[in-house]
Amino acid sequence: MNFIKKVIGGGSSKSKTDIKIEDEQHEQQHEQQHEKQQIPDKISTSKVNSPCVPPTCTYISKENVRSDLSLIKDFNSAYYYNYYRTLEKNSTNLLTSPGLNTKVVSNQFTLKEFNIVSEMTDSCIVSVWTQKYSNLSLTPVEAVYQIPLAPYATVSDFSVILKDKVLKGKIKENEKAKEKYNDAIASGGQAFLAEKVEGFFKLQIGNLPPQEDVTVNITITSEIGTHLESLHFCLHRFIFPKSAFKFNYTLNASLSTPIETIEMDHFQPTITYKDESKTNATVTISTENGVSNNIIAIIVPKYSEKPESFIEYSPIDKSYALAINFYPKFSVGLDEVDQKSEFIFVLDCSGSMSGKPIEKSKMALEICMRSLNENSKFNIVCFGSNFNKLFETSKHYNDETLQKASEYINRIDANLGGTELLEPIVDILSKESDPEFPRQVFILTDGEISNRDKLIDYVGKEANTTRIFTYGIGSYVDKELIVGVSKACKGYYEMIVDNSDMEEKVMKLISIAMQPTLSNIKVDWGVLSNVVQSPAQIRPLFNQERMMIYATLDKEPTEKQVTVILSGNGPLSERISFPVDLDFSKANQSTSHIHTLSAFKHIQDLEESERKEKKDNKDKIVKLGKRFGLVSKHTSYIVTADSDKVTEETMKTVQVLEPTQQINTSPGSGSGFIPTTRVQGSSSVFPSSPTPLSGPSPYTVCAPPPPPPTSSPYTNCAPPPPQFSRCIAPQPYQSAPAPPAPPAPSRLSQAQSQMDYCDQELLCESLEGDLLVEEEELECKEIECSPPQKLSYITPFAPTSQISQSSRECRSKKSSSPTIQKSSSLPSRPSTSSSSLIEIIRQQKANGSFTKSSVSSFINVDTPPPSSDIPEDVWTTLLIIANFILNFDSQKSQWELVSQKATKFVKQQIIKSSIASTFETLLESAKKSISN
């Protein structure tokens, strides 16, 4: 018996216009909220019951792992969607593409029917696209279109049905495939070419005779999109023509654990569970009006506390392929975390940072330095027209390097001219990362750079080795630089408009970076031999991330039941092992999906080796492409057929994704790219740089912002050149100097420049509208919501808890992190000055302790401890923690990590010195001493 969740006969009864309007409203609401949700909530510190028992990592209960559904559905925050987010951001670049204004008769070559059948498992998804085209032209045509092909997807099969003949595509080297295509066209025959071109899938249907129909079958193999504990499958609206056509979609999900929920916005699908176990489900959609919205299937499986494995067997070559899927969660107090990590802070020291921005940044850096633990490595990089570094390479964190960092920070000034960020980032990321110390980079900047897209493309290629956090300072910062760089490397970002809260916002991201991590992950394959693992280097598993590993075995294993060991460095700096049981006797023989995806991931490793190590892996890539039928940078699919009648007429070239006179600007309207007619010899409608969207658009939205009396009427417009100041400060490891910076423009000239710029660009608002809705600044004041709702805190490695709606509505879009209600059992006191707090924090040693002599000018340290067995530095550190709680409650975000490190030191000393009192008892005594 089938279990039906929803049954909707055929497609939705709503008109296409109604759907578009609803989609616009949904997308606008969604964009206004997703930035607020993109940073995980702060995590409460769990208490240790006994001071004499070392903390341990344990799995958390299933009841604590489920995220709020609105966060699970927030696909904009998912890493896999960053590719499409970038396309959406830059889709208006195509307004300047050649041939935009060329008119194509829409009924010459049309898509009549589009069917997609997808097979989803826990590790991969394979989709077969069947597209039926009709050529009503009186002359032969060459049809050309390109669709986005995400970097985690590839074409793995290709065939054509022409005149009732099924023509199977063959993988060839790119050059040979193109030669064969051109030869077939020149001889009057038909040809079909499928290839991957710089991030897009390009399909050419050549020399299709008049009045002939053709059916194209394409198989796309892809990794599963993941977000929090959910699995996503996205069919972006940009892949569909804007015309009406019949569309049928079937998704067959077969998971290893029961399915808890299936969600799909914009559509009312039929969802059928095959049995009561709910491990298998079928989702179907049908419509006669084409597709104008994203199709995103969101499946939430039941949480599994252990790695899951999936095995395939290929009887053709007697090989096995397997996938390992793991979403770990640990329960460990933040003051107990002692994991290794590398922290690199990159600070903008251009002239425009002079004054309060650079001073506040230096204060924030001082706090960051005291928040690191002794298992860290770190470095500081200052950049402008050139850059310099604290150390040539990152150094281990100790009292000596901490002192050098403080001296270096004290010398920092806004004296480095312009804003050239690419060079220092390349210098950082080109150095081989240490898997023992996961690399995390923090960038603080207030400007914009000329090579933004090149930078985003570059850092995106390093996402497996590095996580990047970004801070945008001030009103003139390039927001897409801040958002794009962080999302490309699976990091987070903050927009800092008001310098007064800079330290708080900087520490929010530092707190995220400190959350428990599983790093230096390796698989011990044991008795298995000739294992090809991909990716070869496994990315560290940060909070709320899922790991996917693939492997192929060309030989039969000697044993049918094998246990391999997945291991990594845990949050307590210990080595943690997870056994993974493999039963080869139960291998699936009906599909080759994991074989294909494993080969694709291996090809990606080889291509990355070509990029970084300059190796020539073309022969290996071509061999894998031919064996598994994969399109790559070196391989394409080709189909040729001799025509019954040689075509001698002139062939017309048309775009399948045909242009339209009316430019839809809603992000939910399915407008996407503005396609154009392809004429012989013209360049592609799509950009041709390594990044699908490189190159700044000459069109910029300058929609007027809301008019609060204190804000400039031009704050949303493109800024004039940044202001510079000139001064000299000694800096170690100076890079090559740059020419002198230009003189600073006056504020009046800046405002006039903005006014002139916006006057020239008002046309863009009507052209683009909501396409760049994420760029619109909703000038909501950052006020304390009244009354704010408390958040229910969760343990480390648990997904974000729900954020109250009132908090979301009160937040500014310039801040992407959720508003957190501070919890304290003590009443709030008037805060002492921020400078006083910074001076206290500066006295902390690398191990987290404070000495009596260093803090005697800030607090009364002469109060004796409650017992004589308490060492002086332990009691002094307790007094400082109590002082933070009692006198700096309103600045908790600044000292919270400093206090956690101090707490960790005290707890370690309690165990080491066999002190009878618990930490909580001693802290209460310290509070009483501070209060007296």
Swiss-Prot record:
Residues 15-39 have a biased composition (Basic and acidic residues). Disulfide bonds: none annotated. Residues 342-521 form the VWFA domain. It holds the Pfam family VIT. Residues 677-686 have a biased composition (Polar residues). It comes from the Eukaryota. Residues 1-49, 661-752, 800-834 are annotated as: Disordered. Residues 95-222 form the VIT domain. Residues 815-834 have a biased composition (Low complexity). PANTHER family: VON WILLEBRAND FACTOR A DOMAIN-CONTAINING PROTEIN 5A (PTHR45737), VON WILLEBRAND FACTOR A DOMAIN-CONTAINING PROTEIN DDB_G0267758-RELATED (PTHR45737:SF1). This is von Willebrand factor A domain-containing protein DDB_G0292028. It comes from Dictyostelium discoideum.
